[in-house]
UniProtKB/Swiss-Prot annotation:
The record marks 95 as: Important for activity. It comes from the Bacteria. Its EC number is 1.2.1.70. It comes from Thiobacillus denitrificans (strain ATCC 25259 / T1). During catalysis, the active site Cys acts as a nucleophile attacking the alpha-carbonyl group of tRNA-bound glutamate with the formation of a thioester intermediate between enzyme and glutamate, and the concomitant release of tRNA(Glu). The thioester intermediate is finally reduced by direct hydride transfer from NADPH, to form the product GSA. This is Glutamyl-tRNA reductase.
Length: 416
């Protein structure tokens, strides 16, 4: 079995690819069970966010994973291959540690990814697809993330995606305070965005969600209104700023709906930030003159502002991760030796019992105890020496040189 990470992220794949391989909540458990029941992996966890989709697995067939990944999303593996990365063993552990610590994020040092990773692990645990190896990996991962954040200032002055959305809105409108804001969805990202926009005291805030009951507690926190998604065609024209982040597999805001809204607004602009993957807004909306549409990838420049202040902390964080990876690999290699060590001990126990049984029988016959003990010790010595001497006798010249070195090292020999 082998620890392996396979996936795509904002470094390797554009949004148009990432949205095709995202695992929605309705598909996640199915995917985890498919992976493990098909024997492609004995353990599996899936991390799927707006910036990455990654499989963390314990597998005997790493080559089959990319094919499964493509097949699950009804894609051609040859078209997906240029965007995929496959990281084995220590590289997989290093990657997990870096992701959780925020070193691989679009926003260097951001903390939201750690919560998303914990949710992915909880989902895998609930699905029954975590075993000893992945449990240990993620236990170490969360410990390393905590150490990096407490020992460095990697997250200091970090600009979140939510804060970046506010900054972009301020570039479009003279004042957010005079605008009406619509938030589509009721998840963690929408909550963060509402927190940042509420600090600017917009004229009106409204939450639109598939189920208004789920949105109501969030809306009440910010003194916002609530509408169902079905009301969007009639309501969207009333809003200047729209932030959307749902788990919908299909777009919620179409070009036709927004064209009607712009006409109703007499071509007053609408600012939209689409933080969903797959996208909540049809891609064609970006071509409209009076709509300023920004995707997750478009926020990159804003969130990188101020990064210079945090880059100096990266080396210290990487040093912590390097040490932690070495420790984890040491544990993993030790675990891999357990069957061999157990086999050695079992063989030794069989030899011991065999010689002891012979000795008991000899003593029962009245044989001299000294002779019995001498015979038992010779028998044990011969049993334990048989394997190495037989190996040396039957090895090729190349194998023999390596065996001599190993046996000398194991038994502390110093051959002349």
């Amino acid at each position: 079995m082998q620890l392996l990470t396979l996936g795509v992220n904002h470094h390797t794949a554009p949004l148009a690819i990432r949205e095709q391989v995202a695992f929605g909540p309705d598909k996640l458990v199915q995917a985890l069970h498919e992976l493990t029941l098909s024997k492609r992996a004995s353990e599996a966890a899936i991390l799927s966010t707006c910036n990455r989709t990654e499989l963390y697995v314990n597998t005997v067939s790493p080559d089959a994973l990319s094919q499964w990944f493509a097949d699950f999303h009804h894609l051609d593996v040859r078209e997906l291959a240029p965007y995929l990365y496959t990281l084995p063993r220590e590289k997989a552990a290093q990657h997990a540690f870096r992701v959780a610590a925020g070193l691989d994020s679009m926003v260097l040092g951001e903390t939201q990814i750690l919560g998303q990773m914990k949710q992915a692990v909880a989902a895998a645990e609930e699905a029954g697809t975590l075993g000893l190896l992945l449990h240990k990996l993620f236990q170490r991962t969360f410990s390393v993330a905590k150490e990096v954040r407490s020992s460095t200032e990697i997250g200091a002055n970090s600009v979140s995606m939510a804060a970046a959305a506010v900054r972009l809105a301020e570039r479009i409108f003279p004042s957010v305070k005079e605008q009406a804001c619509l938030f589509i969805g009721a998840g963690e990202m929408i909550e963060l965005c509402m927190t940042h926009f509420a600090a600017q005291h917009p004229r009106r805030m409204t939450v639109a969600n598939r189920t208004t009951e789920r949105a109501r507690p969030l809306a009440e926190r910010f003194n916002a209104g609530v509408i169902p998604l079905t009301a969007l065609p009639d309501e969207v024209a009333a809003y200047d700023i729209i932030i959307t982040s749902t788990a919908s597999p299909l777009p919620i805001l179409g070009k036709g709906m927004l064209e009607r809204a712009i006409r109703q607004r007499r071509h007053r602009p609408i600012f939209i930030v689409d933080l969903a993957v797959p996208r909540d807004v049809e891609a064609e909306v970006a071509d409209m003159n009076d709509v300023f549409l920004y995707s997750v990838d478009d926020l990159g420049q804003v969130v990188r502002e101020g990064m210079d202040n945090r880059v100096a902390q990266v080396a210290q964080a990487e040093a912590i991760i390097e040490t932690s990876v070495a420790s984890f690999i040491h544990w993993m290699e030790g675990r891999e030796l357990v069957p061999v060590i157990r086999g050695l001990r079992d063989a030794a126990e069989r030899h011991r019992r065999h010689e002891l049984d012979k000795a008991h029988k000899a003593l029962a016959r009245g044989d001299d105890p000294h002779a019995v003990l001498d015979a038992m010790s010779h028998g044990l010595a011969n049993k334990f020496l048989h394997a190495p001497t037989h190996g040396l006798s039957h090895a090729t010249p190349e194998e023999r040189a390596e065996l001599v070195r190993l046996i000398s090292q194991l038994y502390g020999l110093h051959p002349e």
